[in-house]
C-alpha cells in the first residue's frame, strides 16, 4: 500500500517509514500540510489516480495548516472510501474524541502507540476502501 505520512517529527517519520516499509508498504513523507495537499491535488487531471492509498496525519504541525485543516480540505475534496485517513496524535483523549465525532470515518490513534495497533488500523482502513 502507498501511504502518505504527514508528521513533523523527524524521529517519528523515520520510525514509521522503516516499520511500515518492513511490512511491505511504500511511505511518502511530508512535514507540512501544504506539501501533502500538493501531492494529492496539485495540477492533476481528474482521471489521474491519487498517489496514496491512505494517509496518516499528525494533528500538531508547523506552518499555516494544522492537521485538522488538512483533514477538512481532504474531506471536502474526497469521500472516505477514496482516501482513508488515520490520525496519529499526542492530543489529549478528549480532543481526539471530539474530532472523532466530527470525522466518524477517520481512525484515531493516540501517541504513544504500539506498532501493532497502527498496522491493524492500516489493514482495517484498507479493507474498508475495497
What does each model-identified segment do?
Residues 7:
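Conserved acidic carboxylate
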Amino acid at each position: 500500500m502507498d501511504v502518505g505520512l504527514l508528521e513533523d517529527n523527524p524521529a517519528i517519520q523515520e520510525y514509521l517509514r522503516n516499520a511500515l516499509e518492513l511490512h511491505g508498504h511504500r511511505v511518502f513523507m511530508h512535514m507540512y500540510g501544504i506539501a501533502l495537499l500538493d501531492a494529492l491535488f496539485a495540477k492533476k487531471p481528474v482521471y489521474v489516480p491519487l498517489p496514496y492509498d491512505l494517509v496518516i496525519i499528525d494533528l500538531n504541525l508547523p506552518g499555516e495548516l494544522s492537521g485538522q485543516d488538512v483533514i477538512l480540505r481532504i474531506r471536502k475534496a474526497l469521500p472516505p472510501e477514496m482516501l482513508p485517513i488515520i490520525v496519529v496524535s499526542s492530543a489529549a483523549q478528549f480532543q481526539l474524541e471530539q474530532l472523532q465525532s466530527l470525522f466518524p470515518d477517520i481512525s484515531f490513534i493516540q501517541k504513544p502507540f504500539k506498532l501493532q495497533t497502527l498496522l491493524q488500523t492500516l489493514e482495517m482502513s484498507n479493507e474498508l476502501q475495497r
